[in-house]
Swiss-Prot record:
NCBIfam families: lepA, small_GTP. Keywords: Cell inner membrane, Cell membrane, GTP-binding, Hydrolase, Membrane, Nucleotide-binding, Protein biosynthesis. Coiled coil: none annotated. One of its GO terms (molecular function) is GTP binding. The lineage of its organism: Bacteria, Pseudomonadati, Chlamydiota, Chlamydiia, Chlamydiales. Disulfide bonds: none annotated. Required for accurate and efficient protein synthesis under certain stress conditions. May act as a fidelity factor of the translation reaction, by catalyzing a one-codon backward translocation of tRNAs on improperly translocated ribosomes. Back-translocation proceeds from a post-translocation (POST) complex to a pre-translocation (PRE) complex, thus giving elongation factor G a second chance to translocate the tRNAs correctly. Binds to ribosomes in a GTP-dependent manner. This is Elongation factor 4. It is found in: Cell inner membrane. Signal peptide: none annotated. It comes from Chlamydia muridarum (strain MoPn / Nigg). It is a peripheral membrane protein. PANTHER family: TRANSLATION FACTOR GUF1 HOMOLOG, CHLOROPLASTIC, TRANSLATION FACTOR GUF1-RELATED. InterPro entries: EF-4, EFG_III/V, EFG_V-like, EFTu-like_2, LepA_C_sf, LepA_CTD, LepA_IV, P-loop_NTPase.
Length: 602
């Protein structure tokens, strides 16, 4: 690390929609500042997971410190990378809190998109210096002037200092570095001498335990200090080492001082001990007040995860435990189901978070799993005045005890070309949405603001939006309040027995169509038996939809050659009684494929 000068430090972040070139620009900045040698360079260097590279998204934020010579001075540039997806908006807000500036990357051909819009507003709330960067300027479809106008009119940013660049060719990269130094303010020197450091991320290392990523706001942190976390109060830990991101995490001598970004290790073993947004201070000279903005991360979407082969239960438990080491937002609780056996009820930040965890389980641990339909947290107000919060149909109380139910709603911004307006309005109406306002983004695109129930978003909203807009629509959402809703428990009965794995909480208006579609799907995937199998959807014991799997026909009179009809009648009568007995005592074996198909449909 170079000699410390707070006026030569620049802490900045990169804000971009998925696939607008954030990771590629980060690669070019690392190359231009010689932070990494050419022979060690690879694409999307800061995206360490294979999944991040394949999907072209940032899941886990990765900071890096670069040094750059400008006008005879050496500057320390700290890039605090952020995940772009709406599921991780709290992590984004904490990463932005560690910065004084941000690069807003916009695709010069596609223009402003919903998720970059959401993160820009977070940056504006924190009063960060935002530098607009128009990427992919080398594309034939690039319209830099039109996109600048869009940014000015819709976001309200001055684009006179906007930089046209191409991460692919390297054009404009030196200008970006110079703009960071000229426009992003250095950290403000603090009058306080007590240590205050903001935790913006953490990482589990099997050798040293939890590495806590911090931006020092005041004071300094060094090896040997005894520190504590201000939200948990009580526990204290000795700092065993401090480090910087060069670009890999590297232990350094000395201390991390006000304005600097780095990490420390303190023999921490559980990621739950380290909360993003918390304030670190010393035990000897503690800070009087913690930094603002800390809140506990709470899961929003829940689903049950079960191994297809019950003997894989311990492997699944181990897999989830390991994933949780680097993901404090993932919650795990053991549960059992009559149909699926032993498994886990898991909480996620959103649908992308859920998909990533599922994919990592099957990929990194080679496990075949079944996941139940995603659910949200419903609020149940009982007649005796008590309030319950439930995320699982099995926890649904007796309907006679319920006063009313409430469901979480979200504020949604949708950006779409004008020609798809009617399609989107139909989709949102089908999803019980309320239109708040419609704004023009430019000559061809609109921004629609809606309120929608979260339950409608977590099912298939993204897929349907992409479908009705031919892939051009994008959206982001933020949580709103709970509102009363006619939420009921839909049960599926197979041969008059309830199968808990197919039960779900739905809005009354959608119960019949949902029940019918599940019954129709089950008729296709459950093999016929020697007796008729009724498949029914029920609400509070009342059947609302029914399908029947016809019995396999067995010719019991095949051995009778002509002769008296009474002999045949006796055999048919005997078969009839046998089928009746089988229906009463026979068990319908539901293949795993049936669970997979129905839950995929949900």
């Amino acid at each position: 690390m170079k000699p410390y000068k707070i006026e030569n430090i620049r802490n900045f972040s990169i804000i971009a929609h998925i696939d607008h070139g954030k990771s590629t620009i980060a690669d070019r900045l690392l190359e231009s500042t010689s932070t990494i040698e050419q022979r060690e360079m690879r694409e999307q260097l800061l995206d360490s997971m294979d999944l991040e590279r394949e999907r072209g998204i940032t899941i886990k934020a990765h900071p890096v410190t670069m040094t750059y010579e400008y006008e005879g001075e050496t500057y320390e540039l700290n890039l605090i990378d952020t995940p772009g997806h709406v599921d991780f908006s709290y992590e984004v807000s904490r990463s932005l809190a560690a910065c004084e500036g941000a690069l807003l990357i916009v695709d010069a051909a596609q223009g402003v998109q919903a998720q970059s819009l959401a993160n820009v507003y977070l940056a504006l709330e924190r009063d960060l210096e935002i530098i607009p960067v128009l990427n992919k300027i080398d594309l034939p479809a690039a319209q830099p002037e039109a996109i600048k106008k869009q940014i000015e009119e819709f976001i309200g940013l001055d684009t006179s200092n906007a930089i046209a660049c191409s991460a692919k060719t390297g054009q404009g990269i030196p200008e970006i570095l110079e703009s960071i130094i000229r426009l992003v303010p250095p950290p403000k020197p603090s009058q306080e001498t007590e240590l205050k450091a903001l935790i913006f991320d953490s990482h589990y290392d099997p050798y040293v335990g939890i590495m806590v990523y911090v931006r020092v706001i005041s004071g300094e942190i060094k090896k040997g200090d005894r520190i504590t976390f201000m939200s948990t109060k009580g526990s204290s830990f000795e700092v065993l080492g401090i480090g910087a991101f060069l670009p890999e995490a590297t232990l350094i001598e000395g201390s991390l001082r006000a304005g600097q970004v780095g990490y420390f290790i303190a023999n921490l073993k559980k990621v739950k001990d380290v909360k993003i947004g918390d304030t670190v201070t010393t035990v000897k000279h503690p800070a009087k007040e913690p930094l603002e903005g800390f809140k506990e991360i709470k899961p929003v979407v829940f689903a049950g995860i079960y191994p297809i082969d019950s003997s894989d239960f311990d492997t699944l438990k181990d897999a989830l435990g390991r994933l949780q080491l680097n993901d404090s937002a993932l919650t795990i609780e053991q549960e059992s189901s009559h149909s699926l056996g032993f498994g886990f009820r898991c909480g996620f930040l959103g649908l992308l978070h859920l998909e990533i965890i599922f994919e990592r389980i099957s990929r990194e641990f080679d496990l075949d799993i079944i996941a139940t339909a995603p659910s949200v947290i419903y609020k149940v107000v009982l007649k005796n005045g008590k309030t319950l919060f439930i995320d699982n149909p099995t926890a649904y109380p007796d309907p006679a005890l319920i006063e009313h139910m409430e469901e979480p709603w979200v504020h949604v911004n949708i950006i779409t070309p004008q020609e798809y307006l009617s399609n989107i309005m139909s989709l949102c109406m089908d999803k019980r949405g309320i239109c708040l306002k419609t704004d023009m983004l430019d000559q061809h695109r609109l921004v629609l603001s809606y309120e929608l129930p979260l339950n409608e978003i977590v099912s298939d909203f993204n897929d349907k939006l992409k479908s009705v807009t031919k892939g051009y629509g994008s959206f982001d959402y933020r949580l709103g309040d709970y509102k009363p809703g006619a939420i009921i428990k839909l049960e599926i009965l197979i041969n008059d027995e309830t199968v808990d794995a197919f039960s779900c909480l739905v809005h009354r208006d959608k119960a019949e169509s949902k029940g019918r579609s599940i019954c129709e799907k089950l008729v296709d995937v459950i093999p016929p038996q020697l007796f008729k199998i009724p498949i029914q959807a029920a609400i509070n014991k009342k059947i609302i939809a029914r399908e029947t799997i016809r019995a396999l026909a067995k010719n019991v009179t095949a051995k009778c050659y002509g002769g008296d009809i009474t002999r045949k009648r006796k055999l048919w009568e005997k078969q009839k009684k046998g089928k009746k007995r089988m229906k009463e005592f026979g068990k319908v074996s539901i293949p795993n494929t049936a669970f997979v198909e129905v839950l995929k449909m949900e």
